[in-house]
């Protein structure tokens, strides 16, 4: 299996009941595969996935790692809408990123190589992260609230010169973790 693939199963009903949609790679629209956008449980058999509540990889993002999610609250959703998904692009296990207070890599900078439950406890003086550089091999999840809570955003290897590039509506980020459970 490539590091970009895996298997995820979406179920219409809670506790893995009802119709099932099995996905092995990018799926930009569940309805194109004959599956309505209502998902009440998910089983991630392999890989780590980013799921969106709208088709075409748009809307609220949910990060799902190997395991079982018997109801939508388990993946921090407030409803059963799900429209698209893709495997997270993992290249290996070397994690490194730089966070910047300002757009275009300006202002206060902080380097991370491991999980951080509260950025301000490590000396980042603001809760605004406006640009990010992800080096190394791994992917990261950034959260709007401390302790890996709230709205989440995925960043993979590359440069993000503004918060809109990771589909955030605002630059508020207070905790960050690595995605390590992807096989």
From Swiss-Prot:
PANTHER family: BETA/GAMMA CRYSTALLIN, GAMMA-CRYSTALLIN N. Keywords: Eye lens protein, Repeat. GO terms for molecular function: structural constituent of eye lens. Crystallins are the dominant structural components of the vertebrate eye lens. Residues 6-46, 47-89, 95-136, 138-180 form the Beta/gamma crystallin 'Greek key' domain. Belongs to the beta/gamma-crystallin family. It comes from Danio rerio. This is Gamma-crystallin N-B. Has a two-domain beta-structure, folded into four very similar Greek key motifs. GO terms for biological process: lens development in camera-type eye; visual perception. Gene3D superfamilies: Crystallins (2.60.20.10). Monomer. It comes from the Eukaryota. InterPro entries: Beta/Gamma-Crystallin (IPR050252), Beta/gamma_crystallin (IPR001064), G_crystallin-like (IPR011024).
């Amino acid at each position: 299996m490539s590091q970009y693939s895996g298997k995820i199963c979406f179920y219409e009903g809670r506790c893995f009941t009802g119709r099932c949609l099995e996905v092995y790679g990018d799926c930009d629209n569940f309805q194109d595969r004959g599956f309505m956008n209502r998902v009440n449980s998910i089983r991630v058999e392999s890989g780590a996935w980013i799921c969106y509540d709208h088709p075409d990889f748009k809307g609220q993002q949910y990060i799902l790692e190997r395991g079982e999610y018997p109801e939508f609250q388990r993946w921090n959703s407030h409803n059963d809408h799900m429209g698209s998904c893709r495997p997270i692009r993992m290249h290996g296990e070397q994690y490194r990123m730089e966070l910047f207070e300002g757009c275009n890599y300006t202002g206060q900078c902080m380097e991370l190589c491991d999980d951080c439950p509260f950025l301000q406890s490590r000396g980042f003086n603001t809760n605004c992260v406006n640009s990010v550089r992800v080096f190394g091999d791994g992917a990261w999840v950034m959260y709007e609230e401390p302790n890996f809570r709230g709205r989440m955003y995925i960043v993979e290897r590359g440069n993000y010169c503004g918060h809109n590039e990771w589909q955030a509506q605002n630059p508020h980020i207070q905790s960050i973790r690595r995605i390590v459970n992807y096989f």
